[in-house]
Amino acid sequence: MSGLNKKFTVIGAVALIIMDILVLTGTVKASETSTFSSFMWNMVPAGLLLGTTVLCVNFDVSAKKVAGVISVIVFGFMAAFRALAFGVFIYDRITLENPVAMTYSDYTKTAELVGYMLLMVAAIFFIMFLLKGAFRKTTTIISGISFAIIVGAWVVNLYNLINDAIFYDAAFSEILSAFISDGLVWSLVMVIAYLSTFASNLGLLKGAEKKD
């Protein structure tokens, strides 16, 4: 693993530790979910993505195969879970007895579900790349799209929060409280963790491209 990849991996690991502390202490949790659910559905896949990268780069073939099989199963389940959550959310919106217009929050929640679902799919392709040397371009493209969606949703949420704060002339403490309660801190740590890990993985993908 190159020096740059190691730096990005460390950044991702630190972000994951911060996320773990926030989740387990109940300081921050994904909206409308318990602390345990937040940990299971968000912390675990991020940790596995990071851990598998380290295993596949630094250990022998047998470790790669074990890590690869476990990760493909887990990330496949995660992608299916995100797809199910997305489907349930849309179904609920369509079948409401008194349908209401979609809000910015609804749109960003939908975007985040799609973004993380694509990210799980990208993770599967990345593991296959590490094991087989294939799917390099596919991994890069899907990962890039997923991050664009996730980061875009975060920016929109932040923009709406600032707009509301200006409109209601909110105090700084109220803005900070809203920033935390709206899940923006959680989302930011998630983005840093995933993005730094992806940057490390992208270095591996580019390294493979030079060897082709």
Identify the role of each PLM range.
Residues 40-51, 114-121, 188:
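Membrane-embedded alpha-helical segments of multi-pass membrane proteins
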Residues 16-31, 52:
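Membrane-embedded alpha-helical segments in integral membrane proteins
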Residues 28-38, 88-114, 156-188:
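Interfacial non-cytosolic loop connecting adjacent transmembrane helices
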Residues 7-22, 76, 193:
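Alpha-helical transmembrane segments
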Residues 80-139:
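Membrane-proximal helix-loop-helix units in multi-pass membrane proteins
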Residues 10-14, 65-83, 140-154:
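Transmembrane alpha-helical segments of multi-pass membrane proteins
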Residues 2-6, 55-64, 124-145, 161, ...:
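Cytosolic juxtamembrane helix at the C-terminal end of the final transmembrane segment
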Residues 20-27, 76-88, 151-159:
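Hydrophobic alpha-helical transmembrane segments and adjacent interfacial helices
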